[in-house]
Amino acid sequence: GTIVFTPPPHQETKKYMDELIAYMNDTKDGVNPLIKAAIIHSQFESIHPFDNGNGRVGRLLISLYLYKAEVINCPFFYMSEAISQDKRVYYNMLTSSRTGSYTDWITFFLKKCVVQARSHISYIDSLNNLYERTKRTLQNTISTPKFDQILECLFTHPVLNGGFLADQLGISNAQARRYLDALEGSGILQGDDRKRGRTYYFVDLLDLARRA
């Protein structure tokens, strides 16, 4: 196929990476962090320091830098979904940025930040709705001082069995199995077909996680 990009010679990789890291750590340059994240991503992809995985690491850098710059309060802003919707445009914009024309690339990047942010908000809303629905169903299913612990366990461990739940709650295996059977009966969990040592799945949460 046609070669669309050739990274700099490997002998220069360290120099360019050192310069990029210094730019990332410069907190007094007055550049808006979102614009700076766009430049950082473009520069990293141009340096292309690894044999493979540069795209994944470059997208991860966006999240880590925005977290470092306190634009987001946790380093979980992954751009892959938004970028994949216009992958050809993404590569074209990166190519134009390598000639020093950053305006189109930054504009594209900022628009994709909006798309990704809206997607994350939608996911969080769906997760909150699932939490409230599950809480209501659980309240109508079991009455126990362990209620909050069971609810937390479901959302932190959507695949579980009786032994695990017993350990988490500090209860007997028999009591844990009774809870799990009740949760299966209410539709919160789905158990496998085994008669003993069954594994239970919080399918609604697992499905939501796959769409994230």
Positions of predicted regions on the chain:
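FIC/Doc superfamily catalytic core
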Residues: 1-212
